[in-house]
Design a protein with these regions (language model features):
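N-terminal secretory signal peptides that target proteins for export/translocation
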Residues: 1-2
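Sec-dependent N-terminal signal peptides
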Residues: 5-13
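Sec/Tat signal peptide C-region and signal peptidase I cleavage site
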Residues: 16-21
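Early exported N-terminus immediately downstream of N-terminal targeting peptides
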Residues: 23-103
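A mature extracytoplasmic/lumenal domain signature
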Residues: 71, 91, 115-117, 129-132, ...
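Surface-exposed, charged secondary-structure patches
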Residues: 97-139, 190, 194-197
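Short beta-strand edge/turn micro-motifs at domain boundaries
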Residues: 138-167
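Low-complexity, intrinsically disordered terminal/linker segments enriched in charged
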Residues: 157-197
Length: 197
């Protein structure tokens, strides 16, 4: 009987954890993302743990597919269905590695979430600041939150001190493609090489 009781408790706890959803309010959503990241990035956590947890967070909170389409721009029209599937598969791996490798060396980042600016029904900008330390100045960070589905906001871009990371990535991808005479599949090689490092 006790065994059955503990199994039921375990299943209930597991269901509660899996069914956790971030807030639908863009500002609160970003606050929850920031708070969760702080817990992941404490000094006592290993780099492997940080990488795993940050990847899980990104898969839940970032519109990776949307970022992938934006990063490719009009070049996506040159891909057939199978090539697009391969690109999206590679981009997700590329994005997660790029995202986690930038953050795992941080420990206990202090970010204050400040205000929101509703651009239109699809986008809200959430403004925040990475507080200064003895070694680094404060950094202004704007989160571009995609709100087409109001029940599930997703991050589409980070704008750091006025520099859009998504736009920078789009320009880098375009440079690779243009260097290879417009051959989009050459970008696949670049993505594979980055993931394999």
């Amino acid at each position: 009987m006790k065994k059955k009781f503990f199994i039921i408790i375990f299943l209930i706890c597991g269901f509660v954890q899996k069914s956790f959803a971030y807030s639908s309010d863009p500002k609160q959503f970003i606050q929850e993302v920031v708070d969760e990241a702080k817990q992941v990035l404490i000094d006592s956590n290993s780099k492997e743990y940080k990488t795993k947890k940050l990847s899980e967070m990104a898969l839940q909170t970032v519109d990776i597919k949307g970022v992938a389409y934006y990063s490719l721009g009009n070049y996506r029209k040159k891909l057939n269905e199978e090539q697009m599937k391969e690109y999206l598969f590679l981009f997700e791996k590329y994005f997660l590695k790029s995202f986690t490798s930038r953050l795992t060396d941080y420990s206990d980042p202090k970010i204050d979430v400040l205000t929101t600016d509703v651009l239109n029904p699809k986008y809200t900008i959430v403004k925040s600041i990475l507080l200064a330390t003895d070694k680094k100045p404060a950094v202004n960070i704007e989160w571009r939150v995609y709100t087409k589905n109001p029940d599930k906001p997703l991050i589409r871009d980070l704008i750091i001190e006025g520099l859009s990371l998504a736009r920078t990535q789009k320009e880098e991808f375009a440079s690779v493609i243009e260097t290879n005479n417009g051959d989009v599949t050459k970008l696949f090689i670049t993505l594979k090489e980055f993931v394999a490092k």
